[in-house]
């Protein structure tokens, strides 16, 4: 019995350590994303994978009758958004966003990084619609050869706006061991604001409001949640019920239900209360991290990329939609971030963290082109045409891998330069310390000799 108990005690801390590692959890999600693409297109597994993804699960007395693939997107992903909401609340209260002046540059960069990709996406697709192989004003899908009007393809303008914070930090952890913490803090702040803006995009552009009375229920759930999580002893069963009710009411109201997680997360206290050792928002986010990073995100990625292509070939890389997403994420994201940073510091008079220059942010800005989670979600919401949705998710996957590879190379080189600079600075500091020590010894020797007392002590130090 003791052995079993010890094993259980050892397994959960290990799971939490894995979930806390941006590098490992990011690689796990990438593995599931690639597995979904393979399983959906291998002849031996495609039928079984589709059967599982399309199996419907319903909740009685509601309109909730969704296939498992949609439950992963609308249900499990709520855990991720709850974690995001809790982290946002903590950052807004005591973290990097608590002081707007200090966070001004990365906050503005997040806005710039969300404006530029849609512009490049629309410009690229517009060029293909005018000068591509199809009729003017339309584009050709690589998988089926069918013609899609530019107006319909332009619905995906929001797909390349989001940054996947988990993958971006995973790339930093893999390739940037010697970088100063200010670069990671900059990326964290930028990605946090990016998440907030992406949530607003989903709420405004990809929700269709139904009956207004559901909003009364959502408001009641919000008030009850805010009260319950402030009690000295939190009634977890009641909290869980309120959270589920808020999710159902969001769904019934026509708002994307994952936003229920953000709502209740933002209502959770982010300051220490009742004599506790840490804020509740921080603790709850820490406890939810394993479920978010190792359950919700991998399963979502599995089904999000698990789209079947009739003709899986390298021609997919020549799809106008895929190329537009690559340009938007790999070029547009870093371009928007760097240009905004330059304007903010050189024109706006704002300052970056001490020791950081705008060009130091280029590798991290390229890492912001890694889309994945929220981009997959927006691709599913933006296109009702399944062929377009499939190509969009494939484009996000390819663009994210390219951005990760480029940023990995740039971060590795930058890390070596910082490491060399740190070594030179350390050597100079040691040399200066030796000189100062030698000077002190000589001064002590001369002062002792100049002492007129009978007892003279001379200390010769080598």
From Swiss-Prot:
GO BP field: regulation of pH
Gene3D superfamilies attached to this UniProt entry: Na+/H+ antiporter like domain
Catalysed reaction, written as an equation: Na(+)(in) + 2 H(+)(out) = Na(+)(out) + 2 H(+)(in)
Name used for this protein in its record: Na(+)/H(+) antiporter NhaA
Organism: Bifidobacterium breve (strain NCIMB 8807 / UCC2003)
Function: Na(+)/H(+) antiporter that extrudes sodium in exchange for external protons.
Organismal lineage: Bacteria, Bacillati, Actinomycetota, Actinomycetes, Bifidobacteriales
GO MF term set: sodium:proton antiporter activity
Matches recorded under HAMAP family: NhaA
Family the UniProt entry places it in: Belongs to the NhaA Na(+)/H(+) (TC 2.A.33) antiporter family.
Any one Gene Ontology cellular component term annotated for this protein: plasma membrane
InterPro entries assigned to the protein according to its UniProt record, in alphabetical order: Na/H_antiporter_dom_sf, NhaA
Entry's localization field: Cell membrane
Sorted UniProt keywords: Antiport, Cell membrane, Ion transport, Membrane, Sodium, Sodium transport, Transmembrane, Transmembrane helix, Transport
Membrane topology classification: Multi-pass membrane protein
Membrane-crossing segments per the record: 24-44, 66-86, 102-122, 156-176, 196-216, 235-255, 256-275, 290-310, 312-332, 361-381, 392-412
UniProt cross-references to PANTHER family, sorted A to Z: NA(+)_H(+) ANTIPORTER NHAA (PTHR30341:SF0), SODIUM ION/PROTON ANTIPORTER NHAA-RELATED (PTHR30341)
């Amino acid at each position: 019995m003791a052995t079993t108990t010890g094993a259980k005690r050892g397994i959960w801390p290990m799971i939490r350590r894995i979930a806390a590692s941006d590098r490992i959890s990011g690689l796990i999600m990438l593995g599931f994303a690639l597995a979904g693409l393979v399983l959906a297109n291998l002849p031996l597994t495609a039928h079984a994978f589709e059967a599982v993804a399309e199996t419907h699960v319903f909740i009685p007395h509601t309109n909730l009758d969704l296939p498992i693939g949609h439950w992963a997107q609308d249900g499990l992903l709520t855990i991720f958004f709850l974690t995001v909401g809790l982290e946002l609340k903590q950052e807004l209260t005591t973290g990097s966003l608590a002081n707007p002046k200090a966070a001004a540059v990365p906050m503005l960069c997040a806005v710039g990084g969300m404006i530029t990709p849609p512009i490049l996406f629309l410009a690229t697709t517009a060029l293909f619609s005018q000068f591509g192989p199809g009729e003017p004003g339309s584009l050709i899908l690589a998988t089926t050869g069918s013609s899609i009007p530019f107006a319909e393809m332009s619905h995906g303008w929001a797909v390349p706006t989001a940054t996947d914070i988990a993958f971006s930090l995973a790339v930093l952890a893999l390739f940037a061991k010697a970088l100063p913490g200010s670069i990671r803090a900059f990326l964290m702040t930028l990605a946090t604001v990016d998440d907030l803006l992406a949530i607003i995009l989903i709420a405004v552009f990809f929700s269709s409001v139904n009956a207004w009375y559901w909003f009364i229920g959502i408001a009641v759930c919000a008030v009850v949640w805010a009260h319950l999580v402030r009690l000295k002893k939190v009634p977890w069963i009641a909290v869980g019920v309120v959270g589920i009710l808020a999710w159902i009411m969001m769904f019934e109201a026509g708002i994307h239900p994952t936003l229920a997680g953000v709502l209740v997360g933002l209502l959770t206290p982010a300051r220490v209360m009742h004599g506790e050792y840490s804020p509740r928002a921080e603790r709850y986010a820490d406890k939810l991290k394993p479920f978010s990073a190792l359950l919700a995100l991998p399963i979502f990625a599995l089904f999000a990329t698990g789209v079947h292509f009739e003709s899986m070939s390298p021609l997919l890389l020549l799809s106008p939609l895929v190329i537009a997403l690559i340009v938007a994420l790999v070029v547009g994201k870093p371009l928007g971030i760097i240009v905004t940073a330059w304007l903010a510091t050189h024109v706006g008079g704002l300052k970056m963290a001490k020791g950081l220059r705008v060009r130091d942010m280029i590798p991290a800005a390229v890492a912001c082109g890694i889309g994945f989670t929220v981009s997959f979600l927006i691709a599913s919401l933006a296109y009702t045409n399944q062929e377009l949705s499939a190509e969009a998710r494939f484009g996000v996957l390819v663009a994210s891998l390219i951005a990760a590879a480029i940023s990995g190379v740039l971060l590795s080189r930058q890390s070596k330069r910082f490491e060399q600079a740190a070594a030179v600075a350390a050597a100079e500091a040691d040399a200066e310390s030796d000189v100062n020590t030698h000077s002190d010894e000589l001064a002590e020797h001369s002062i002792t000799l100049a002492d007129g007392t009978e007892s003279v002590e001379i200390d010769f130090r080598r």
